[in-house]
């Protein structure tokens, strides 16, 4: 018998002072049985960083041909493709050719550093690719926010993401390994 995804609900209030964007959203995240709590919370953080009414989570781990989240336009084109982890060159190329903008969130300190050394020059070929890195310590702190029902406040200013709920406060500094040219 196949294991089912665990459903998480998040009510998120985003005040993105860098983009002058303010948004309240009720999100549903399906955590695949093979997905860690840290990875699920990184998906949520990626959504917060690029918050938009049209930004949607996809089937994620269940669908190899889709990103973790995407922002589709009215013509069904992909304006933003959000990827997590350490994808191979083929996956990066696919994302960068199908979407106007691609945001990759790398994590897992040791593996990510090695992956970046091996893929940095290949990633530089894609002018629409952003590569963000979140270290293990911040990712562990972020995972403490995980709850089946979450109410989160997020403020983004000067590149920092301030996240809070009824119990926790956290400042997250994503490291920009690559920005679009």
Curated annotation (Swiss-Prot):
InterPro entries assigned: Restrct_endonuc-II-like, YaeQ, YaeQ_sf
Entry superkingdom: Bacteria
Pfam families referenced in this protein's UniProt entry, alphabetically: YaeQ
Name of the protein this chain belongs to: Uncharacterized protein YaeQ
Gene3D superfamilies the record matches: Restriction endonuclease-like alpha-beta roll domain (3.10.640.10)
């Amino acid at each position: 018998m196949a294991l089912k995804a665990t459903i998480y609900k998040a009510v998120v209030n985003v005040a993105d002072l860098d983009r002058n964007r303010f948004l309240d959203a009720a999100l549903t995240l399906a955590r695949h049985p093979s997905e860690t709590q840290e990875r699920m919370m990184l998906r949520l953080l990626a959504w917060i960083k690029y918050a938009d009414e049209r930004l949607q989570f996809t089937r994620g781990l269940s669908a190899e041909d889709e990103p973790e989240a995407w922002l589709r336009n009215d013509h069904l084109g992909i304006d933003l493709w959000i990827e997590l982890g350490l994808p191979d060159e083929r996956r990066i190329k696919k994302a960068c050719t199908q979407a106007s903008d691609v945001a990759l969130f790398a994590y897992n300190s040791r593996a990510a550093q090695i992956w970046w050394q091996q893929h940095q020059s290949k990633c530089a070929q894609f002018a629409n690719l952003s590569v963000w890195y979140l270290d293990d310590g911040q990712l562990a702190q972020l995972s403490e926010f995980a709850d089946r029902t979450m109410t989160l406040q997020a403020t983004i200013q000067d590149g920092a993401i301030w996240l809070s709920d009824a119990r926790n406060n956290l400042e997250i500094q994503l490291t920009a390994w690559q920005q679009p040219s």
